[in-house]
Amino acid sequence: MASPEPRRGGDGAAQAARKTRVEANSPLPKNSGSLNEAEALNPEVTLSSEGSLNLEDILYLEDTGDLDETLYVQETEKAEEALYIEEAMQPDEALHVEEPGNPEETVCVEETTEPDRIQFVEGPVEPGKPTSPEHVVYEGETVTRAEKSNPEESLRAEQSPSMEENLSIEDLELLEGRFQQCVQAVAQLEEERDQLIHELVLLREPALQEVQQVHQDILAAYKLHAQAELERDGLREEIRLVKQKLFKVTKECVAYQYQLECRQQDVAQFADFREVLTTRATQLSEELAQLRDAYQKQKEQLRQQLEAPPSQRDGHFLQESRRLSAQFENLMAESRQDLEEEYEPQFLRLLERKEAGTKALQRTQAEIQEMKEALRPLQAEARQLRLQNRNLEDQIALVRQKRDEEVQQYREQLEEMEERQRQLRNGVQLQQQKNKEMEQLRLSLAEELSTYKAMLLPKSLEQADAPTSQAGGMETQSQGAV
């Protein structure tokens, strides 16, 4: 905001009058231009008098600097004309004192030695004291002026009320022009405020759209995550069922393998027992062959004996050989029958067990082959399920990574928006503080204007009474001269 320039003339006088009236004739360390520092136009007066901005409308403003720049109004071209009142008096003129008739009224002392300053001192006048020597206190300095009893100065004292009246009227006109400019500035600020609110709405819409888009992306990611988790749970259930089935098949396979091993052990035992029986049969066959050889030899001997000439001894020997041959045949038949009775059931049982073991082995091998054939698709399915599970885990990891990135981005955007909100709040607080200052300035200006008007009203009345008294004095002088 541009620094205001000090005002001259009537502003300093009005301020001095107001200060002396409030502080009961105490010296003030302020110059006549101190009021002008609060006089500069601030757009926050418009906001405080017309209405405050809505906080929800400015929460999403990008930069508070633009708001401050648009709310400031430059000084008008005729600021010096509105703030300065030039005096038309000569610097050689002395201090003029106006004494009202009532001793309790204030005395207005106007010093015209300096063209840039008008000093007003208000204070009660004691009826017994003369007012010719007067002490003026302003900014810690005491000014003593003695009124001269010169007829020229008395004429100047008579002419000063009319000049003060002219200056006061011009000051009022300038103040009215200043207030008109303030009203125009207020209207312009209202238009700028509406434009800024419209820009705020336009700036807030993309941010809201981005936030909604981020929310939709997060919801879609959560949906994909939930769907992937459901698929993962379904695949885990299928894998569990396949594992149970595979465990059952493996258990049955182990049981069949145990039975096969038992049958193989039985077959091995049967083979050993068969070898024993075969060895026994071989021994018996050898014994039988030996017996047959012995029998053939005896038979040949007996035949030779029979072919020999018969004799008594030969007959006896022939009978004996026949008896021995019959015994031998009976013995062979009995031994063969005993062997058949002893080993044939065992051999038949062994053959039956061998056939049953062979059939069981073939059946077990067929079942094992079938189980292997059935296990191959299960293994392929298990491999496929493991591959799908790995792919799903990779997809879940990617979805989680994407979700984390989106959440991080959303958090960063949220932090940026919170930072903007804090900046906007600080800007709003500063703006409210400026509004309060401008409201105080407006109130002080209104109070000063009312004080100035109250000062001008008795002066105008005194100036209206002064011509009549002056005319009466001239008549008395003319009569005295006659």
Swiss-Prot record:
GO terms for cellular component: cytosol; intermediate filament; neuromuscular junction; perinuclear region of cytoplasm; sarcolemma; Z disc. One of its GO terms (biological process) is intermediate filament-based process. Residues 459-482 are annotated as: Tail. Residues 168-463 form the IF rod domain. Residues 1-161 are annotated as: Head. Induction: Up-regulated at the sarcolemma in individuals with various forms of neuromuscular disease. Residues 466-482 have a biased composition (Polar residues). Residues 350-458 are annotated as: Coil 2. The keyword Coiled coil applies. It comes from the Eukaryota. Residues 1-10, 144-156 have a biased composition (Basic and acidic residues). The keyword Cytoplasm applies. Residues 170-204 are annotated as: Coil 1A. Keywords: Coiled coil, Cytoplasm, Intermediate filament, Phosphoprotein. InterPro entries: IF_rod_dom, Syncoilin. The modification Phosphoserine is found at S26, S34, S325. It is found in: Cytoplasm, Perinuclear region. Residues 1-42, 144-165, 460-482 are annotated as: Disordered. Belongs to the intermediate filament family. Atypical type III intermediate filament (IF) protein that may play a supportive role in the efficient coupling of mechanical stress between the myofibril and fiber exterior. May facilitate lateral force transmission during skeletal muscle contraction. Does not form homofilaments nor heterofilaments with other IF proteins. PANTHER family: SYNCOILIN. This is Syncoilin. It comes from Homo sapiens. The gene is SYNC.
